[in-house]
Amino acid sequence: MPVITLPDGSQRHYDHAVSPLDVALDIGPGLAKACIAGRVDGELIDASDKIDTDAQLAIITAKDDAGLEIIRHSCAHLLGHAIKQLWPDTKMAIGPVIDNGFYYDVDIDRTLTQEDIELLEKRMHELADTDYDVIKKKVSWQEARDAFAARGETYKIAILDENISHDDRPGLYHHEEYIDMCRGPHVPNMRFCHHFKLQKTSGAYWRGDSKNKMLQRIYGTAWADKKQLASYLQRLEEASKRDHRKIGKQLDLYHMQEEAPGMVFWHNDGWTIFRELEAFVRMKLKSYQYQEVKGPFMMDRVMWEKTGHWDNYKEAMFTTSSENREYCIKPMNCPGHVQIFNQGLKSYRDLPLRMAEFGSCHRNEPSGSLHGLMRVRGFTQDDAHIFCTEEQVRDEVNSCIKMVYDMYSTFGFEKIVVKLSTRPEKRIGSDEMWDRAEADLAAALTENNIEFAYQPGEGAFYGPKIEFTLHDCLDRAWQCGTVQLDFSLPGRLSASYVGESNERQVPVMIHRAILGSMERFIGILTEEFAGFFPTWLAPVQVVIINITDSQSDYVNELTQKLQEAGIRVKADLRNEKIGFKIREHTLRRVPYMLVCGDKEVEAGKVAVRTRRGKDLGSLDVSEVISKLQQEIRSRSLHQLEV
């Protein structure tokens, strides 16, 4: 009979099979009331599942990340319960957990309106408020199929037919009269599911295939308590104010249009930001001793067959043909960089060779997934590939890590979550090679005093990788940086160098990205700064404003001085009230407004005002220029003080 070992090392002995809920009740009524599920020997199980062998058990509550995920998953079932009561002919597809919430894809014979969503949410609350028990039953495959056939649930039947073995015993979760199928676990009672909000709807193809029927996807968020929900909704409201699509339009940075889905039309001010960011990256490339190259944006399909992309990635590639040859527009830069490496004989003395490119790449992303600058079809990668020997891997990874943190700190990103993905089951190379590669990556992180978590089995088949996920001011996660070892591509494309023993050897290739894509990173920065770009990035850094026509010559003279000093400046000589002009440029997030009246002209000064409304007083022009140059040169995140 089972001996249950708890996280504190204490043990409880039973003469019969017990569930996590039984053990929680044995410990105390408070824990039993809070028990959502159990973690048995590392595996999550339902609170009602029986344990009949010796095991380690942790009781999962709403305070645990796993508990919150279970709450969200059960809220998806609650949505299904409610929608079937309101519109019984609805057919349920899939309802997984996502970041901060859940969704459910439904096949319903009406276009869901905002009023429908509000009605659905109300019914969900009414059901949850009854605190009904959720009953789990393990049944045979045929029993599950019969249950869904009786309810006309064609999508559930398809899941059973295509994804579940006839020998399996699927879990059916009974929410009163509503039944759903899931691996689980789920909450034992709906008292855990009171704090949720339905958010929006969108279209989604069944199985993600555009050849299939378009379903309606209903999104929601769910939390453990009222305070967490309110805090999240407040963050969402702030995120809406910072939406890069809104700010991009307000500041005239770029636009997208139907004739070129997922492609960016950069306007002058947006392109100025792009070029400044590019110049910053280019400066860092020089300091870290990279070559900058430029490969073709299109190559023969034969090349992509050699790399393996044609077999594994062709659905995401744009193609064209000419003179009976088929070409692929590149989705990534790496094959082109190997071709550059292959030109001319390379010696071990030439390594490491660090090759970077602002590569124009295109990927055929589904139209429904496109989202402003964050998800596009045409993008520019700040991509680099390092060709080195196995002995050089550790030092090169070390350098990559330093470069990542060096660049992120410039933008004020301090919270960076790092994960090391290790060997998958299907992989190339020997265990010894993987041992060394994983050890090199871990050692480089440790040498830089970086905390990281392992992701076992999540590496690519051709090598382990480090992922850098930065968190913005709203604590949203953006996976941008990657350091990926590649033991496959150089060999596939016949890359080699002459080693110390005068024999040809295949180099190790390190894929390195920091920003990820220029477009997406500009989107992230737009939201991080809410359009208040630091002065060095701002499209217009200074506007000089006259009060009356009598200061026009002085304004023009100052404008020329600032331009000659390398400052992006505009003169506003319009016949408008000074308050109107200041308000307009403040809304345009121009960092500094220099106001010139008769007093300033006479004294050879300017009245300096920041976009945040701070009055810095009347300053000498030379002092203003010097301080602005210093702020821009240092890429400061803070505006000047007097």
From Swiss-Prot:
Disulfide-linked positions: none
Residues that, per the record, bind Zn(2+): 334, 385, 511
InterPro entries: aa-tRNA-synt_IIb, aa-tRNA-synth_II, aa-tRNA-synth_II/BPL/LPL, Anticodon-bd, Anticodon-bd_dom_sf, Beta-grasp_dom_sf, TGS, TGS-like
Co-factor: note: Binds 1 zinc ion per subunit.
GO terms for MF: ATP binding; metal ion binding; threonine-tRNA ligase activity; tRNA binding
Ranges for domain TGS: 1-61
Protein's UniProt keywords contain Protein biosynthesis: yes
Name of the top EC class for this enzyme: ligase
Swiss-Prot/TrEMBL catalytic activity: tRNA(Thr) + L-threonine + ATP = L-threonyl-tRNA(Thr) + AMP + diphosphate + H(+)
UniProt record, GO biological process: threonyl-tRNA aminoacylation
Compartments where located: Cytoplasm
Cofactor (UniProt): Zn(2+)
Listed SMART domains: tRNA_SAD (SM00863)
Family: Belongs to the class-II aminoacyl-tRNA synthetase family.
Role of this protein: Catalyzes the attachment of threonine to tRNA(Thr) in a two-step reaction: L-threonine is first activated by ATP to form Thr-AMP and then transferred to the acceptor end of tRNA(Thr). Also edits incorrectly charged L-seryl-tRNA(Thr).
Subunit structure: Homodimer.
Name by which UniProt lists this protein: Threonine--tRNA ligase
Native organism: Pectobacterium atrosepticum (strain SCRI 1043 / ATCC BAA-672) (Erwinia carotovora subsp. atroseptica)
Organism lineage: Bacteria, Pseudomonadati, Pseudomonadota, Gammaproteobacteria, Enterobacterales
Name of the gene this protein is made from: thrS
